[in-house]
């Protein structure tokens, strides 16, 4: 059965002021149920940071090359409550170090100031309201902006001087889908290539933003159904999408399941190759053995072939 966005909101019990749909991100792994094996994201080096912090004029052991200047910053989920069901969940926290002329000028840990900061992560609206995402996966610098990215939603612009959040960024109102947390920048043109997936048609949209950050192309693409797409690949002339058998489950979503996707071994498993300057009809799909892929590492062209290097799972569950 096909559902559009309005019908889904009605079935999920949404009103104008309601926000109670489950997250598009939940447990992708089996939870530990023994005291001897606590969830690894709650202990040790993965233990959540309990507050934002800042320090200046940091002590350096050894020497930092004076030519190494700039900002090193990372993003990741920080479960301030310490109760999340999966390590993918947790408000996005940025950790950054500013290096200048052999000195470590400052370190800061700052939350991405999203509309759902300090709220239950299972209330993430994802593709339904793209600004309501935890923005906790990665960052990219493009078009003079530093952007914090999440699994399903819009980016947030970050101030590189202090890691504060400037604004939600939707490319001047042009972006009408979520944005992947793994965009690719063409080193020859400066063009940023990315996609957004959705649980409603169009299930997949391919985007291009030029070197200045202007969104110049948004191309809806036909897929078999709503599938989870975390990453994609890019070569000099092509982009490669992966439609894999982790698919959206309306029945799970309506019961507020924290992860309304299921493994369906009978679903399509294929890669789609599209010329960067192509139209939807130019997509070529190639069936592959049943598997799931979170991340690609590299892609390139060799004669008439397109080669993709990726981490492959025989099954997600």
Pin down the residues of each PLM region.
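Beta-propeller blade signature
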Residues: 205-211, 256-278
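C-terminal segment of N-terminal export signals and the immediately downstream linker at the start
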Residues: 23-62
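N-terminal secretory signal peptides
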Residues: 1-7
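Short, conserved, GDST-rich strand-edge loop motifs in beta-rich repeat architectures
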Residues: 77-83, 244-263, 313-317
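Well-ordered mid-protein domain cores that form the structural environment of catalytic cofactors
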Residues: 112-217
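A conserved active-site cap/scaffold subdomain adjacent to cofactor or substrate pockets
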Residues: 266-317
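Structural motif
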Residues: 201-207, 249-251, 268-270, 316-317
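N-terminal export signals
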Residues: 7-29
């Amino acid at each position: 059965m096909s559902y559009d966005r309005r019908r889904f909101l009605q079935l999920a019990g949404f009103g104008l002021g309601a926000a109670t749909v489950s997250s598009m991100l939940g447990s992708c792994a089996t939870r530990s149920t023994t005291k001897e094996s606590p969830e690894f994201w709650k202990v040790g080096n993965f233990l959540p940071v309990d507050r934002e912090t800042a320090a200046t004029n940091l002590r350096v052991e050894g020497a930092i090359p004076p030519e190494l200047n700039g900002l090193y910053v990372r993003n990741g989920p920080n479960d301030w409550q310490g109760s999340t069901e999966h390590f993918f969940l947790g408000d996005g926290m940025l950790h950054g170090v500013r290096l200048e002329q052999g000195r470590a000028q400052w370190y800061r840990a700052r939350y991405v100031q999203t509309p759902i900061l300090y709220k239950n992560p299972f209330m993430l609206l994802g593709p339904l309201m793209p600004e309501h995402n935890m923005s906790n996966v990665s960052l990219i610098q493009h078009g003079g902006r530093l952007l914090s990215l999440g699994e399903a939603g819009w980016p947030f612009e970050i101030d590189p001087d202090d890691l504060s959040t400037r604004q939600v960024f939707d490319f001047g109102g042009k972006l009408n889908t979520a944005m992947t947390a793994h965009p690719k920048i063409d080193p020859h043109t400066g063009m940023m290539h990315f996609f957004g997936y959705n649980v409603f048609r169009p299930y997949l949209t391919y985007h291009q933003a030029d070197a200045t950050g202007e969104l110049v192309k948004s191309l809806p693409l036909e897929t078999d159904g709503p599938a989870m797409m975390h990453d994609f690949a890019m070569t000099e002339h092509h982009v490669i999408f992966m439609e894999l058998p982790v698919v959206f489950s309306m029945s799970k979503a309506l019961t507020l399941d924290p992860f309304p996707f299921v493994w369906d071994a009978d679903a399509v498993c294929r890669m789609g190759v599209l010329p960067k300057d192509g139209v939807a009809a130019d997509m070529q799909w190639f069936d592959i053995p049943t598997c799931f892929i979170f991340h690609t590492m590299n892609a390139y062209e060799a004669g008439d072939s397109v080669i993709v290097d990726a981490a492959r799972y025989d099954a997600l569950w």
